A protein has these predicted regions:
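Mid-chain, well-packed structural core segment of small domains
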Residues: 81-105
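HotDog/MaoC-like acyl-thioester-processing domains
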Residues: 1-21, 97-149
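Hot-dog-fold acyl-thioester-processing enzymes
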Residues: 2-85, 146-149
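Conserved hydrophobic positions within beta-strands
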Residues: 75, 93, 107-109
Length: 149
């Protein structure tokens, strides 16, 4: 593998220096049937809780819910805007999310490791009713100076 160019190394330094502990990035979206269909098609997640209204209706969910990783993937939108490459991601699913729900994803830069040139970010997801539906975190490094505002 070839060595990184001096220009790329400088770009990484600038990206690292531009992120600070305490910075917050937010992304909001309303999930649609199309989102679920595309996600199921790409992942092959054929879980009846996501596809079968009758099956899900007889469960404690009372109706179909969207795949948890679809909700969790909102963090990748923010990470992409930050030019962030994750090395680790963890999630805790707290409440179901349904088609039509509007979810807000908030990423907070929590730790900056100057030695490893990595960050740890906390991520929290709330629905339109202000209920926390998912939480987690990710670790990695910025690769670009593009920052979500």
């Amino acid at each position: 593998m070839p060595d990184a160019t001096p220009q790329f190394k400088q770009q990484l330094r600038e990206a690292f220096d531009s992120l600070q502990v305490g910075q917050i990035f937010t992304y909001r979206r309303t999930f649609t049937e199309g989102d679920v269909s595309l996600f199921i098609g790409v992942t092959g997640d054929l879980n009846p809780y996501h596809q079968d209204e009758m099956f899900a209706g007889e469960s404690w969910f009372k109706r179909r819910n969207i795949p948890g990783l679809l909700t969790a993937s909102m963090a990748t939108h923010i990470g992409g805007m930050m030019g962030f490459l994750a090395t680790e991601m963890t999630f805790q699913y707290l409440k179901p999310v349904y088609v039509g729900d509007t979810v807000t994803c908030v990423v907070t830069v929590m730790e900056k490791d100057d030695e490893k040139r990595q960050f740890f970010c906390a991520v929290n997801y709330t629905n339109q009713d202000g209920m926390e539906v998912l939480k987690g975190g990710f670790r990695g490094f910025p690769s670009d100076v593009r920052l979500a505002k």
